Design a protein with these regions (language model features):
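Mature catalytic domains of secreted/periplasmic carbohydrate-active enzymes
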Residues: 1-287
């Protein structure tokens, strides 16, 4: 079956006379770092021209590039034996592409320590991928919710692709602009716990998301619900320095066990941090 389309330039085969040439032109003109497909539910990849486009992209690129997982329905040999009731068809995204993608989903499904695959969470600040003029404080992520979500994604080894919903004039709605400024302020003070970090077991547990520096010399704990005393499932060396990133002030700690008998440390937060309306981040020297 051919895709027929009419328009300024009539074509008989939409994929091979229009889609593939347009993709090639785009790749040649803009030299993208990523091709982000979004067609994994309609047709098989071969019918959509996905393989031809991917091959061209990889072959002409003179830098590291990546393609996501949504390049078409799976071929029989690709999906054979991969799906059960517990692993439905959408799990094909976890076994293909340079990175797989998740929409408004549960990040706990997106990491497997034994078989990790790069992944990306995709969502808007609001609950829609388009502009909703009715968005208000109840329909968009609060700054606290966003920071906790972002920390959880990074702690699970993921990237966040955040959509900003422009209005009909191409402007950022005020409520979303406010969120971006608040998020930016938090990251300016606590970004060390987010950027260029790696996942740190136990990833996210009991409201705390864990990351670490690339060289492993420092671990980070992002606490979504601050209080005066926090248990962290980390085992720093004796005398290690723990510091609040926002204020650069040291905090007191001691070895302890939680109610399950799991080893870790008990941390005392100062009053200002304990009463914070936003998550707080700690750095923990591990070496």
């Amino acid at each position: 079956m051919e895709y027929k389309a009419s328009g300024k330039i009539a074509v008989n085969d939409f994929v091979r006379e229009y889609t593939i040439p347009q993709a090639v032109e785009f790749i040649d003109k803009y030299s993208p770092d990523i091709l982000w497909y979004d067609a994994d539910w309609s047709e098989k990849a071969a019918k959509l021209g996905s393989y031809e486009i991917a091959a061209y992209f990889y072959n002409v690129s003179e830098k590291p590039v990546a393609i996501n997982d949504r390049y078409g329905l799976g071929e029989p040999e690709e999906i054979a034996g991969k799906f059960t009731k517990e692993r439905p068809r959408q799990w094909l995204r976890t076994v293909r592409g340079d990175f797989y993608t998740d929409e408004y989903g549960d990040t706990s499904e997106c990491i497997n320590a034994e078989n990790y695959h790069p992944w990306e969470a995709c969502r808007g600040i609001s609950q829609s991928y388009g502009n909703n003029w009715q968005d208000d404080e109840n329909s968009v992520l609060s700054t606290k919710e966003f920071v906790a979500l972002f920390a959880d994604i990074v702690a699970h080894g993921g990237n966040l692709l955040l959509l900003v919903n422009l209005d009909g004039q191409g402007s950022i709605p005020e409520i979303q602009m406010q969120r971006l400024k608040e998020i930016g302020k938090w990251l300016s003070l606590n970004g060390e716990a987010i950027f260029a970090t790696r996942p740190q077991a136990p990833y996210t547990k009991e409201g705390v998301s864990y990351t670490r520096s690339k060289d492993g010399s420092c671990a980070y704990a992002i606490i979504s619900e601050p209080k005066s005393e926090i248990f962290l499932q980390l085992m720093p060396p004796k005398g290690a320095i723990l510091m609040l990133l926002e204020s650069k002030s040291r905090v007191k700690w001691d070895y302890a066990k939680n109610i399950k008998g799991e080893p870790g440390i008990k941390v005392g937060l100062p009053k200002e941090a304990a009463e914070s309306k936003l998550p707080v981040a700690l750095s923990v020297k591990m070496k």
